[in-house]
Curated annotation (Swiss-Prot):
Catalyzed reactions per annotation: a 1,2-diacyl-sn-glycero-3-phospho-(1D-myo-inositol-5-phosphate) + ATP = a 1,2-diacyl-sn-glycero-3-phospho-(1D-myo-inositol-4,5-bisphosphate) + ADP + H(+); 1,2-dihexadecanoyl-sn-glycero-3-phospho-(1D-myo-inositol-5-phosphate) + ATP = 1,2-dihexadecanoyl-sn-glycero-3-phospho-(1D-myo-inositol-4,5-bisphosphate) + ADP + H(+); 1,2-dihexadecanoyl-sn-glycero-3-phospho-(1D-myo-inositol-5-phosphate) + GTP = 1,2-dihexadecanoyl-sn-glycero-3-phospho-(1D-myo-inositol-4,5-bisphosphate) + GDP + H(+)
Uppermost EC category: transferase
PANTHER family named in the record: PHOSPHATIDYLINOSITOL 5-PHOSPHATE 4-KINASE TYPE-2 GAMMA, PHOSPHATIDYLINOSITOL-4-PHOSPHATE 5-KINASE
Residue ranges of the TM segments: none
Annotated protein name in UniProt: Phosphatidylinositol 5-phosphate 4-kinase type-2 gamma
EC identifiers of the protein: 2.7.1.149
Record flagged with keyword Phosphoprotein: yes
N-acetylalanine PTM positions: A2
Amino acid sequence: MASSSVPPATVSAATAGPGPGFGFASKTKKKHFVQQKVKVFRAADPLVGVFLWGVAHSINELSQVPPPVMLLPDDFKASSKIKVNNHLFHRENLPSHFKFKEYCPQVFRNLRDRFGIDDQDYLVSLTRNPPSESEGSDGRFLISYDRTLVIKEVSSEDIADMHSNLSNYHQYIVKCHGNTLLPQFLGMYRVSVDNEDSYMLVMRNMFSHRLPVHRKYDLKGSLVSREASDKEKVKELPTLKDMDFLNKNQKVYIGEEEKKIFLEKLKRDVEFLVQLKIMDYSLLLGIHDIIRGSEPEEEAPVREDESEVDGDCSLTGPPALVGSYGTSPEGIGGYIHSHRPLGPGEFESFIDVYAIRSAEGAPQKEVYFMGLIDILTQYDAKKKAAHAAKTVKHGAGAEISTVHPEQYAKRFLDFITNIFA
């Protein structure tokens, strides 16, 4: 892992939008040693290398100025850019020419704060070691080395949708005090390498950074074409769907109070999505089997050329993390209390924010991870055309997934309400 500061090179930086505001009062946070150097990490993929470099540069720049007292409309249009042109610039680790852009830096800084994520922890979790690829996702999907964050490669249309809804999303997060089942959006970036633009969206991982998921479902409340393919089912951890959930007689066993709180939160979130005419979202359900999870696993032999943390991101064995509270940052997962090791099925609720443990006396000892995903699809002309085509194919009364936002929400809530025992 290489580390250095930016050398004299053709590096141009620009910030669009308002300058820094005044300091503002926020909750007490642990103190960190601010790193003055921008770290550069070796990454097999130039795109990932530039992304890591860009995030480190961005967080370092933000750390030099206090957060604004309040966000202004211009903050939701702002961006910061940097362009590097030098064939000697970190040539072992990075391409010689690249551009990096962060969208709405002050807005996402504020969102990270509201979600209880310190900027230095965010930086460490993303960049201490390169992220790993996760299989079986639409588009490119990366998981941070400590498994607390996911980096999803999205389209320029997704970025445009995020931009148009970001102000509403931020207002909603303020209103609900960050207590939501919606994705926690933490950063939005564009990376340009070899004249090709890639767009990256960083979110909190809905699954645990330490409890492996043994089964997962993507639930929409539709029964047409909602069964995992044979190709999907043979994967180590297939993404199962609505029909699979029903066919397996799967149920979620949580206490009545937890169920009440969850459904209230879900209804509130779905009402927000309906207001924005958003649909086609899913409930992502991950299930950790506590008995299975407490069984010792065979350790794989370590190769001589492996680094200290090899960044493997299979869903079956997260790396061990050392707790550190108050000095050098250990990343988002580094808050684990070192004086009390977590037992089987235990989790820190402020890290694994989507987790709910099964009720006492439930037939299965499990931990459930439940959150809303794919919330960027708005009901537009393309959706209307798809709905018309599916109606012709399946009939007007069929349980097809492409319907109006209000219909989608009602069907979705009806289905999810019935997944509980």
